[in-house]
Amino acid sequence: MGRTSAFDRDDVIRAARDVFWARGYAETGVAELEEATGLKRSSIYHAFGSKKGLFEAVVARYLDEVVRSRIGRLQQPDAGPEALELYIAEMRAAIASGTPRAQAGCLLLNAACAPVVDDDPDVRALVTAYTDELRAAIAAGVDSARPEISAASRAALSEVCASLVIAALAVARVDPDAADRSLGAVHTAVASWVSA
C-alpha cells in the first residue's frame, strides 16, 4: 500500500502560486518553493514531477480561480452588451487596488516575459493558450456589445481590445499607471458602444 500525502495539495499550490506570482517562473528557485510550501524538494518532485510540473498545477489553478472567474461571464449565452464593460472596469479596479497581487501583475504574462519561455515550449504553450482564451473571451464580449456591425469589424475591435488588455496586464507590475491608461482607453471605447 502506497503512502498517502501528509500535506494538502491545494495549500501547496496556493503557496507556490504566491511565489511564482511574485518572482516569476524563471526567477523562482526550488529552495524558495520549499520554504513557501514547507515541503522538501523530494516531496515537491514526488507530488508534481518537477518545478515545471508544480508551475503547471499553479497555472491550472490560477486559470480556474483568477482568470476564468472573470472572463467566463463574457462567454455566457446570456451575456449582455455591458459584460465587456464590466470586465474592463473590474480589471481597472483590481490594478488600482494596489494589493500585492495587483502589484505583481499577471502570473502568466510575467512568465511570458522571462527568458525561459524562449527555451521551454511547454511554458510557451501555457502562455499562448492563456492569451488565446483571453482573446476568445474578449471577442465574445465584443460580439455581445456590437452585434450590429460586420464580423470583420467585430474581429478587428476584438483584437484591439485584447491587445490593450494584454499590454495592460503585462505592464501592471512595473507601471500600474500605464496599465490603467490602456484599460481606460478600452473602457471608454466599450462604454460608448454600450450607450450608443
Show the residue positions of the predicted features.
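Hydrophobic alpha-helical connector segments
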Residues: 57, 71-104, 148-151, 157-158
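Short, structured helix-loop boundary elements
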Residues: 9-10, 30, 52, 56, ...
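Solvent-exposed, amphipathic alpha-helical segments
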Residues: 15, 19-22, 69, 73, ...
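Short, basic, alpha-helical segments at the C-terminal edge of helix-turn-helix-like DNA-binding modules
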Residues: 61-66
